[in-house]
Amino acid sequence: MKTRRSSLAKQPHSIRVFGFLKWGYSLGLALATVVGSGAGQEAHSGRILVMPRDDGGRAALAEAHRGRGRQVERIFPRLGYLQVVRLARGESVSRAVAECQTLSVVAWAEPDWVVTANGLFPNDPYFQNGTQWALNNYGQNGGVADADLDAPEGWDVVATASNIVVAIVDSGVRATHEDLSENLWRNPVDGTPGFNALTGGHDPWDENGHGTHLAGTIAAVANNQRGVAGVAWRARLMVCKFLDASGNGYTADAISCLEFARSNGAHIVNLSWGAGTFSLALSNALWAAQSEGILLVAAAGNNASNNDLVPYYPASLPLENLVAVAASTRTDDRWTFSNYGPASVDLFAPGLAVYSTASGGDSAYESRNGSSMAAAHVSGALALMRQQSPGSTSAEILAALRRAVDSKSAFADQCLTGGRLNLRKALDWPAVSLGSSHGMAQVRVAGVAGHSYVVAASTNLTEWAALKTNTAPANGQWLLTDSDSTNFPGRFYRAQPGP
């Protein structure tokens, strides 16, 4: 359930939350076109995914594989012993899947689908010169003023997320980049920054550039007089590579990355890729991550289609901890190619001409478009929210994220919230306390100096009436006396970020 969180107080009776990836054509990979539930979709031509029915059947299943000349390449013990099975030479994927599904010891089998990549005021030069419009838009380069995240206002509240690990499951990262190296997560065993599912090793070097760009948007080193500023200063970036130099990869390798992230303390996983074909194996892996409180951020896709009508996975998966993000422009419109969905997409975030770190060199930067970039902005925002509220549940944080939008007419029928992410609203929730004076309720609001807040009252927690909007003074605190409170014993009050 998507709920709204607010700072509440009750009067006593006396007073009282892209470049994208899609299933499709792949370069340099062995492919098979599979006919069936995923008709026309590309899959690995020599590999399938098989789920054993129970522990007792695994030995019999292994014998069945051997008898057909197949080999189990990989097993995921924490995902019900899901198997990655290498087929016999010349064996077709469709036939192998169909045959496995007839075995009494198999719960289900599916192809190994292909995914493809899509494409404080810090002193960082590209922030200061206005190139990073997504963080601070004052109308530069044809934009509309304030069609941004309100990042500087959010950073007034919290700017760093040094306790939070964000896993980027993508094409890897250029680990030596001047704006990224300091913020990379390091494995306590060997000091490496993550995992490479393509090699099985721990060197997730980016040969494509997609992952490096996402990394900079999420958590480029800020205030270092270089390059760009990330949304979450000092967040730790865990790099999990499953896409190759052409931006192509397989479900099995994505699952390996998810399992690595889950096993090594990731708080947030960025999923800037997707497909039109449902994978039960991938869904189970994401559900397992969610069950441990990990927040999942998925790009809505770049097909200019309605995800309510044509689902796009993993963004369309019905997971409580998953937020689906569409791409907005510098004028607060939907980016032409961004997917949308009144019920299946949660919110918009900047995804056009997003400037960030590039994999071409240690001081390289570039601009990219897509819901991938939009998702990265949300991952950074969630890192700051998790840092700020370590005791909050994942459901509470995502409810707050979904509430923290600027409502815009362009998004009213395009996503669940009808708005674009506002970082300041996600972070700037004031404390509220109640007192009394001469028989009337006094509401004390403690926020950030110079920020505006709205105090509202309700008798039923459903219908709220705004009492006053005020800008917090230098000490951040102000007091409101409700002269009407004597007529409403049991009245509730709340304070929220103002306009």
Residue ranges and their predicted role:
Residues V239, S256-A285, E292-I294, N321-A324, ...:
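C-terminal subdomain of the subtilisin-like protease fold in secreted/lumenal serine endopeptidases
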Residues G38-N123, T131, E153, S162, ...:
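Inhibitory N-terminal propeptides of secreted protease zymogens
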Residues I294, Y312-Q387, G391:
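Extracellular S/T/G-rich loop segment that most often corresponds to the catalytic His/Ser-adjacent loop
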